C-alpha cells in the first residue's frame, strides 16, 4: 500500500555534508573543518533510515542500549532488511519498506505539493515559463543550443526554490539559516583540547513539511510519532496517511511511489519544447554527457552505514568510504534524457527519477 509520510521539523536541524567537524571515534574523511555546513534538504538515504526507525518502533524492536538477542536480530532483519543502504550494492532488501518516491514538500494547511523549481523556469514568483532555446549550432563538442537573448540573464542566474503544483507559485524563502558558534572538546593525539566550531542549522517554514510517498506492508508504520535526523539528532514529527487521502493523489494510480509523483508532475508541466527534469537526485555514470543544452548542479554524498550487531554508538555508525557524485534535483536537460547509471536499489528509494516536460 502507498502512504504519504510527512516530516515536520520540531527544531532547527543540521543535515551533514562532507564539510563538517568529526565526532570522537568516527572515521575521518579528509574534509573536516571548524565549520559544519548543512544541507537544506534530507537525503533519500536519510529518509529511508527514518522510515526504518519508524518500522522498528511500530514492531517494538527499538532498544536504547542497542542490545538484541539473536531472535530479535532476526526479527529486525525481516522488518527493515539485513544491512544499511549502499550505493555499490544494486540488489538490496529493506524489509517491510518496498519503495520510496523522491523527496518533495507539502503545505499541510493548503494540502498542496511542492517540487524543486525546474532550473529552466523563467517565472520568478508565479507560473511555469520554460526557457526558449535558439537553433542548433555545430561546434567542436557537437551540436549545442543556447537560450534566446532575453531568456537568460546572468545577473539573475537560473531558477531556484520550490514550485507549488496547481497554483504554480514559486517559493524561494521557505528556509532560514542559523549559525551556532562555540567551543567543543576534541581528541588530538590522545589529549582533549578545546576547538572552535561553527555549525549551520536550518529552520523550515512552520506551514511546510518534508514528504515522501512510501510503499510498505500494510500498517507497518506508526501514524504519528517523533523521529530524529541529522547532526545532533534534531526532532521531527512524522505523520502517515494513505496517499489517496491527500487531495493531490486522490484517484491516482501508478506502479510505484516514484511513478505516482512523476505522473503528477508531468501532467502539470507538460508544455512547450522537450525538456527532461530531474525530479530526484541522479546517479551519473563515468563520462556522463550533458547533451545540447542543460542546467545542472552537482553534489557529493557519503551516506552513513550502521552495523546491526554493534552495541557501542560510536562503532555502530560510520561514513561510507566512497564519495558518490550526483546530479541535484531540479536540473534540466534539453532535447533528450541523459543516460544514467542503473541501480535498482537506489531507484527503489527515489533516485534516478526524470520527468519528460513538453515535446
Q: How would you label these PLM feature ranges?
A:
Residues 1-359:
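Conserved active-site/ligand-binding neighborhood in enzyme cores
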Amino acid at each position: 500500500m502507498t502512504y504519504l509520510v510527512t516530516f515536520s521539523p520540531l527544531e532547527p536541524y543540521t543535515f551533514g555534508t562532507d564539510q563538517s567537524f568529526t565526532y570522537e571515534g568516527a572515521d575521518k574523511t579528509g574534509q573536516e573543518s571548524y565549520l559544519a555546513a548543512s544541507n537544506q534538504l534530507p537525503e533519500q538515504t536519510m529518509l529511508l533510515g527514518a522510515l526504518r526507525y519508524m518500522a522498528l518502533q511500530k514492531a517494538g524492536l527499538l532498544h536504547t542500549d542497542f542490545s538484541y538477542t539473536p531472535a530479535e536480530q532476526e526479527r529486525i532483519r525481516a522488518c527493515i532488511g539485513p544491512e544499511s543502504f549502499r550505493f555499490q550494492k544494486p540488489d538490496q532488501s529493506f524489509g517491510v519498506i518496498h519503495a520510496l518516491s523522491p523527496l518533495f514538500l507539502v503545505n499541510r494547511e493548503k494540502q498542496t505539493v511542492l517540487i524543486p523549481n525546474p532550473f529552466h523556469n523563467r517565472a520568478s514568483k508565479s507560473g511555469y515559463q520554460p526557457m526558449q532555446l535558439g537553433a542548433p549550432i555545430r561546434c567542436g563538442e557537437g551540436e549545442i543550443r543556447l537560450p534566446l537573448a532575453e531568456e537568460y540573464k546572468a545577473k539573475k542566474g537560473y531558477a531556484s526554490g520550490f514550485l507549488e503544483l496547481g497554483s504554480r507559485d514559486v517559493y524561494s524563502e521557505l528556509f532560514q539559516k542559523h549559525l551556532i558558534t562555540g567551543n567543543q572538546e576534541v581528541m588530538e593525539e590522545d589529549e582533549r583540547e578545546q576547538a572552535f566550531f561553527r555549525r549551520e542549522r536550518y529552520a523550515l517554514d512552520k506551514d511546510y513539511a518534508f514528504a515522501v510517498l512510501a510503499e510498505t506492508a500494510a500498517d507497518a508504520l506508526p501514524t504519528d510519532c517523533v523521529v530524529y535526523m541529522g547532526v545532533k539528532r534534531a526532532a521531527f514529527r512524522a505523520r502517515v496517511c494513505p496517499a489517496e487521502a491527500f487531495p493531490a493523489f486522490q484517484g491516482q494510480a501508478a506502479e510505484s511511489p516514484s511513478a505516482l509523483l512523476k505522473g503528477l508532475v508531468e501532467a502539470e508541466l507538460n508544455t512547450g519544447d522537450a525538456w527532461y527534469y530531474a525530479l530526484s537526485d541522479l546517479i551519473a555514470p563515468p563520462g556522463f554527457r550533458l547533451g545540447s543544452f542543460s542546467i545542472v548542479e552537482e553534489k557529493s554524498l557519503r551516506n552513513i552505514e550502521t552495523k546491526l550487531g554493534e552495541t557501542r554508538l560510536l562503532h555502530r555508525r560510520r561514513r561510507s568510504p566512497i564519495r558518490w557524485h550526483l546530479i541535484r534535483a531540479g536540473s534540466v536537460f534539453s532535447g533528450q534524457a541523459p543516460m544514467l547509471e542503473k541501480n535498482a536499489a537506489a531507484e527503489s528509494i527515489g533516485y534516478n527519477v526524470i520527468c519528460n516536460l513538453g515535446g
